[in-house]
Amino acid sequence: MTNWLLLIVCLSIACQDVTSAIHQRKSSKNLEHSMNVIHEWKYIDYDFGSDEKRQAAIQSGEYDYTKNYPFDVDQWHNKTFLAVIRYDGVPSSLNVISEKIGNGGCLLQPYPDWSWANYKDCSGIVSAYKIAIDKFDRLWVLDSGLINNIQLMCSPKLLAFDLNTSKLLKQIEIPHNIAVNASTGMGGPVSLVVQAMDPMNTTVYIADDRGDALIIYQNSDDSFHRLTSKTFDNDLRYSELAVAGESFTVHDGIFGMALSPVTNNLYYSPLTSHSLYYVNMEPFMKSQYEENNIEYEGIQDIFNTQSSAKVMSKNGVLFFGLVNNSAIGCWNEHQPLQRQNMDMVAQNEKTLQMIISVKIIQNLAYSGRMNRIHKNEYMLALSNRMQKIVNNDFNFDEVNFRILGANVNNLIKNTRCAKSNNQNNNQNKYKNQAHLD
C-alpha cells in the first residue's frame, strides 16, 4: 500500500512538473509580441489622384469608408497587395499599398490600374476575394463576381497577371455547373491555393464555402472539376463564433486551405467546425478524379475553437488562425495529427482579432560567414475583425485592420512545431486519423 501511495505521489509531482514546463515555455515565448505590426488602418482609403476626385467619389457613393473590408494580403518584392471585397462604396477591390498616408492609414492604389476597378460591364474585377502569387511571378485572382457578398453581378472567374509587366495573362470564367451546388443553388468561392509545377502545368484549388465543394482548375487544358465531401460541410454545432468577447453567427463550409510542398496534402477546415481534414493531391495532379481515387482523412474536433486561414511552410509546418483565441496555431505534419502536437506561435487579443489571411513569403538573405545566399521564410497575417463586419458595429476612430509579420523560424522556435528527431519518421504521423467520405 505504501508503495502505491509513493507511486501516486511521484506521478502527481511529475505531472505538475510537465504542466509547469509547458506554462513556462509559453510565457517565455511572449506570444503577444511574436508578430510585428507592419501596416494598420482605422479605415481603408484610396489614392484617388486629387482631393477633388476623392470628394466626387464620396458624393456619388462610389466610395464609403465604412464599407471597405480587407480579406486577403500577399507580397511580391516591394509590392504588398490587399484585396478588399466589393460592397457598395468600394471603389477598387484589387489593390497595392502605396507609400502615401491618409487619416485612416496607408492609401491603396488599384492594381493594375483604375480601369480594372470598373466592373459594371464585367470587364474589370468585381470582387477579389482571394489572391495568390506563384513562383513564376504570376498573381492569381479569385473574383467571386459578388456585390455586397450576396448579389451576383458577374460570373465568378480566375485571372492571372504577370507581375513583371502587370499585364493580364489569362482570364477564365468558372462555369455555372462548377461554381454552384446543383442541389441547393448555392455557391461562393472564398479560398485559393495555387500549385505551379511549371508555367503550363499549374493547378488551382478553390474552396466553395456556400456550396460545400472543392473546385479544381487545370491551366494546361482550362478544365474545371467540382468535388464534394461531407468533410467540406459546415457543422451547425459551431456556427456561433466569438472574437474578443463579441459573438456572431455564420454557416460557412470549407474555408481556409493550405497545400504541403512536402506531402502534397491539402489541409482544410470548414469555418464552422473544430475539425482538420486533408486530401492528398497526387491523383488530381494526374487528372484522376474518380471517387475511388480520392481519400479524405482527418480528425474531427481536434481544435478547441474554429480555425480560419491556413498556410504551410516549406518544411511542412501548418499554421492556422484560431478564432476564439485571437491566435495563430501550428502543427508539424511530421508529427502525429493530435491536439497535443499542436501549439500556439502568436496570440494577441488586440491585434489578432480574426486572422482572415496568412501567407508565407520567401525572402532572400545573404550569409557572409557561409558566403552564400539562402531563403528565409517570412509570415504575413491579416486581421480584419470579422465580428465587427458581421455585426456592423465598427468604431472607425480606432485601429480595425492590421497586417503583421514575423520570421517563420522565430515563430516556431521552442514550440512543438520545431524540427524534431522524428522529422523524417512518417510511419505513424496520422495514427489517430479517420477515413471520411
From Swiss-Prot:
Q: Does the keyword Amino-acid biosynthesis apply?
A: no
Q: Which InterPro entries match?
A: 6-blade_b-propeller_TolB-like, Royal_jelly/protein_yellow
Q: Which residues form the signal peptide?
A: 1-20
A Pfam cross-reference name: MRJP
Annotated keywords: Glycoprotein, Secreted, Signal
User: Where, subcellularly, is it found?
Assistant: Secreted
**Inducing factors:** Unlike other major royal jelly proteins, not down-regulated by the ecdysteroid 20-hydroxyecdysone (ecdysterone or 20E).
> Can you tell me which residues are glycosylated?
78, 164, 181, 201, 324
**Name of the protein this chain belongs to:** Major royal jelly protein 6
Organism of origin: Apis mellifera
The gene that this protein is the product of is: Mrjp6
